[in-house]
Amino acid sequence: MTTLTAIRDLMYDSFEVHRVLIVGPLRVARDTWPEELRKWDHLKELTCSVVVGSVTERRRALQKPADLYIVNRENLVWLCKNCRLDFDMVVLDELSSFKNQQAQRFKAMKALRPKVKRIVGLTGTPSGNGLMDLWAEFRLLDMGERLGRYISQYRNTYFQPDKRNGMVVFSYKPLPGAEDAIYQKIADITVSMKATDYLQMP
């Protein structure tokens, strides 16, 4: 709800945003986001079009006038190739699904990113497999401003080879102090919530 409230304010109070793309897992894109819009009175003026299903259904959804266009991440590459709409804001729901810089969805979002004024990434596991995951995610958020434009730059700054066979490196480990340095770099655009901050346990 917090993200949708912010979108509503940007769209109808400050008029800074006109069309928003939301990318998420299929069930979340198809069910959760539209349900949140229906649930809260202050969000009822926001309209959405859910871009899922067959190619025909997706094309029809893109032709429908809406404030929010919600697509499942598996169809992001298709959307970037077939959609002529301009989005001035993007929400990546489950940002960690963009952690692989070799994946087609990362490349599609990277190409779209310079055209977008605002971007928000939501995730419960930003570095599920370690700090190396963070580079691709923040490359999309700030276009390389904080952790570098290239993975090699990030790797050389904060990591050292771990498992290797001669000149072939299989894995990397953080340099001493790297974790704190990385978190300090991204702190100004990162909000981290702990369960203990907002859950009342019995």
Language-model features, listed with the residues they occupy:
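Conserved helix/coil segment N-terminal to the catalytic DExD/H
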Residues: 55-89
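Conserved P-loop NTPase motor "coupling/switch" region that bridges the ATPase
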Residues: 45, 89, 106-198
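Conserved helix-turn-beta segment of the N-terminal RecA-like "Helicase ATP-binding" lobe
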Residues: 28-53, 141-144
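Conserved helicase motor
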Residues: 27, 48-58, 73-78, 99-102
